[in-house]
């Protein structure tokens, strides 16, 4: 299982006062909706306020995440689904989303929870989407990472 050794996503984080935007791609709707639901559950449990911004796909996640953070969000949870096909498109989109989201976090100084699934097939996504029968909940994990980092940055910055 790819989630083996993950930090304690069940650890309670106090997200009171944090404004978080879930930025989610629309491709592979069933998986994407599962990721969103997991992120929502985590943010709700932490007491954070949140909203959702939908974008066409994972390639658009960085620019929308940057806009959300520049508009005042304390953190972003970026969720997307990229499934390998028969062309190099998978590699280009995966690299662009990953590199772009990393730059957004570094340039804004605000956390971006990375919930972009890069998959060989749809079954892998369904297994990670936090749906009934899934073994993992990557949407919840990405939201937890964004919240935990926002809290840590708040403490570091005094």
UniProtKB/Swiss-Prot annotation:
Belongs to the DMRL synthase family. It is an enzyme of class 2 (transferase). One of its GO terms (biological process) is riboflavin biosynthetic process. This is 6,7-dimethyl-8-ribityllumazine synthase. Signal peptide: none annotated. CDD domains: Lumazine_synthase-I (cd09209). It comes from Leifsonia xyli subsp. xyli (strain CTCB07). Pathway: Cofactor biosynthesis; riboflavin biosynthesis; riboflavin from 2-hydroxy-3-oxobutyl phosphate and 5-amino-6-(D-ribitylamino)uracil: step 1/2. Keywords: Riboflavin biosynthesis, Transferase. GO terms for molecular function: 6,7-dimethyl-8-ribityllumazine synthase activity. (2S)-2-hydroxy-3-oxobutyl phosphate binds at residues 86-87, 128. It holds the Pfam family DMRL_synthase. The active site is at residue 89. Gene3D superfamilies: Lumazine/riboflavin synthase. Its EC number is 2.5.1.78. It catalyses: (2S)-2-hydroxy-3-oxobutyl phosphate + 5-amino-6-(D-ribitylamino)uracil = 6,7-dimethyl-8-(1-D-ribityl)lumazine + phosphate + 2 H2O + H(+). NCBIfam families: lumazine-synth (TIGR00114). 5-amino-6-(D-ribitylamino)uracil binds at residues 27, 58-60, 81-83, 114.
